[in-house]
């Protein structure tokens, strides 16, 4: 199999960034991508690339971005050999954590029902039509596709996980020049104060950051004046000022630092310069929303909860509850 040609996949978004005046990001991004794919490639990258390359060509692929599953169809259909190659290639990109997706009748039942989160968030958003959007910690890009389905002009997702990137490319490979891109970089890799996005999403990221206030300031720096922040994170019950810092792990995750109360989150947003911050949803995460499937065969939420009291994590902390907040940059 040929080596992964990152220029083929990322030159269009680099050109877009140049054309929209983001030359600082373009310069840094070229260096980051060179290091990622040429100087220090991931040990599994060849395997994932081979799986991507093995997917069958479908000349008449169509997509519906507004269903619960991102759905690819073909009016002419796929023959049995192509369907076998399709499933084998997609299984070569396991585990699939964020979705679901439907590739020409092959349904990928992902670990997370990411459509449930979208259904909770979407009614509260400013109209996404014509907006330029950044999705921080986007996983395999499920929500990026839903944003495009809502009419976004350009969506850029960032997530350092290379497997997520290959899963994203499995979808994009059938869509041609869709205005959605996924960059395998971290939030910290972005230039400060770009101020170029109309909406920035950060969902499932804040609790992984040692300094949550710095993360909020970084997010604010991505937004133009009047831009909208959509923040979703783990929370706990408690008064303003209260935040849980786990002793070690939370739900078996090592990299969880702060689980604030909703009043504390509102104060953080106020102190970091956002306006009109409000809580639009609070939902407990259940084993119906996050679970082991045939496409993600490792441990999942049920294994991270106390078997005698599933309202608590296995470490004895309150079970996962997620809040979505929306705020604007003045």
Curated annotation (Swiss-Prot):
Residues binding carboxy-S-adenosyl-L-methionine, per UniProt: 98, 112, 117, 137, 187-188, 203, 207, 322
Biological processes per GO annotation: tRNA wobble uridine modification
Enzyme class: transferase
EC number: 2.5.1.-
Molecular-function GO term, any one: methyltransferase activity
Chain positions covered by the region annotation Disordered: 309-330
SUPFAM superfamilies, sorted: S-adenosyl-L-methionine-dependent methyltransferases
Protein keywords: Transferase, tRNA processing
Heme is among the record's keywords: no
Superkingdom, natural source: Bacteria
Catalytic activity: carboxy-S-adenosyl-L-methionine + 5-hydroxyuridine(34) in tRNA = 5-carboxymethoxyuridine(34) in tRNA + S-adenosyl-L-homocysteine + H(+)
Keyword Transcription tagged: no
Residues of the signal peptide: none
Function: Catalyzes carboxymethyl transfer from carboxy-S-adenosyl-L-methionine (Cx-SAM) to 5-hydroxyuridine (ho5U) to form 5-carboxymethoxyuridine (cmo5U) at position 34 in tRNAs.
Subunit-level organization: Homotetramer.
Family the UniProt entry places it in: Belongs to the class I-like SAM-binding methyltransferase superfamily. CmoB family.
Protein name: tRNA U34 carboxymethyltransferase
Organism, scientific name: Marinobacter nauticus (strain ATCC 700491 / DSM 11845 / VT8)
Gene it is expressed from: cmoB
């Amino acid at each position: 199999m040929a080596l992964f040609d990152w220029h083929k996949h990322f030159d269009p978004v680099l050109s877009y960034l140049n054309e929209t005046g983001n030359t600082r990001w373009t310069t840094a991004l070229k260096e980051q991508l060179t290091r990622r794919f040429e100087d220090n490639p991931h040990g599994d990258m060849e395997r994932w690339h081979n799986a991507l390359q093995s997917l069958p060509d479908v000349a008449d692929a169509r997509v519906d971005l507004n269903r619960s599953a991102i759905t690819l169809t073909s009016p002419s259909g796929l023959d049995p050999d192509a369907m076998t190659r399709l499933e084998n290639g997609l299984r070569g990109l396991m585990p699939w954590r964020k979705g679901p997706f439907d590739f020409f009748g092959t349904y990928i039942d992902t670990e997370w029902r990411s459509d449930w989160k979208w259904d909770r968030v979407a009614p509260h958003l400013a109209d996404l039509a014509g907006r330029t959007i950044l999705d921080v910690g986007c996983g395999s890009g499920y929500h990026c596709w839903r944003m495009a389905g809502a009419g976004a002009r350009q969506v850029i997702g960032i997530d350092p996980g290379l497997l997520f990137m290959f899963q994203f490319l499995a979808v994009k490979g059938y869509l041609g020049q869709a205005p959605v891109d996924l960059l395998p970089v971290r939030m910290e890799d972005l230039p400060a104060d770009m101020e170029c996005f109309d909406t920035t999403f950060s969902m499932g990221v804040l609790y992984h950051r040692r300094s949550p206030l710095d993360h909020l300031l970084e997010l604010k720096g991505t937004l133009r004046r009047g831009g909208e922040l959509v923040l979703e994170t783990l929370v706990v019950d408690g008064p303003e000022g209260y935040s849980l810092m786990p002793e070690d792990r939370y739900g078996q995750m090592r990299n969880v630092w702060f689980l604030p109360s909703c009043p504390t989150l509102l104060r953080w947003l106020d102190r970091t310069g956002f306006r009109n911050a409000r809580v639009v949803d609070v939902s407990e995460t259940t084993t119906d929303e996050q679970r082991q499937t045939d496409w993600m065969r490792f441990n999942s939420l049920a294994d991270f909860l106390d078997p005698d009291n599933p309202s608590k994590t296995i470490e004895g902390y309150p079970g996962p509850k997620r809040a979505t907040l929306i705020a604007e940059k003045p």
